[in-house]
Amino acid sequence: MVEQLLLPLWNNLATVDDETLPLMSTALLIARDEYPDLDANLYDTLVQSYVEYLRSEVEEISLWPLKMAAVNRYLFQKLGYSGNHDEYYDPRNSYLNQVFERRLGNPISLAVIQIEVARRLGIPLDGVSFPGHFLVRLPVDDGILVMDPFNGGRPLDAEELRERARPHLGGEAPDDRALAQILNPAPHRTILVRILRNLHSVYANTDRWDRAARCADRILKLVPNQPEALRDRGLAYLQLGHRSGALNDLKRYLQLYPSTHNVDMVRGHLVDLSNERIQTH
């Protein structure tokens, strides 16, 4: 009997430890919101077929970087997985089932596949929630090897990493200590929240507020009372005409984050919503 891949339940995720939160199956759970007929076992079987194809080659290699090079050659050259440079903000780039089907994705979705294949082969690959584009990292004897899944798993040296980080740090390149902190392994929860934030951004920027609200709500299933997700869901509810939901979320946001830079905007919405409630009573 073939073991079935069981997707987790949204309402249980907040209490799951970061170390045991399943990465690929929760990423597929995110995709199932948009593709309700998604067959998770199909993609689990697909990943396992990649693993079985690679197993003998990888087991004959002793060094982690060379093992990972074999994985990258297979995924990015033989199978043709690649970054979607032409339509970077296509939401399909964030839905893992679509990345498997089209072999096109964004940095974080490609990283999830890389990590899943590597881990099943015993390779300790981690994600890096790098500013701008998501990366992956592998321990080596003298430190870590950082790779770019959006560009075929290409290795990145310290100088290129500093230059990539610079625009996101006020124009300052990080020193060695700051760079090491940026390159810390990303917990699975952080990776999943970043997938959802990417999707929320795409949907909010294209006025698809029902989906934007859904993405913010899913973040709150992973991280209850996460301030930015409360704000984002509240603003999406406002656009959808769900006034009571907007009022509750935006109030809670200001309670948790009273010094936010957008306090005036949020307070303005709260005043308008409160006035509407008074007028309807």
From Swiss-Prot:
Indicate the segments annotated as coiled coil, or none if absent: none
Q: Which domain of life is it from?
A: Bacteria
- Pfam families, A to Z: TPR_9 (PF13371), Transglut_core2 (PF13369)
Q: Where are the TPR repeats?
A: 193-226, 227-260
Keywords, comma-separated and alphabetical:
Repeat, TPR repeat
InterPro entries listed in its UniProt record: SirB1_N, TPR-like_helical_dom_sf, TPR_rpt
State the family named in the UniProt similarity comment for this chain. Belongs to the UPF0162 family.
Protein name per the record: UPF0162 protein PD_0709
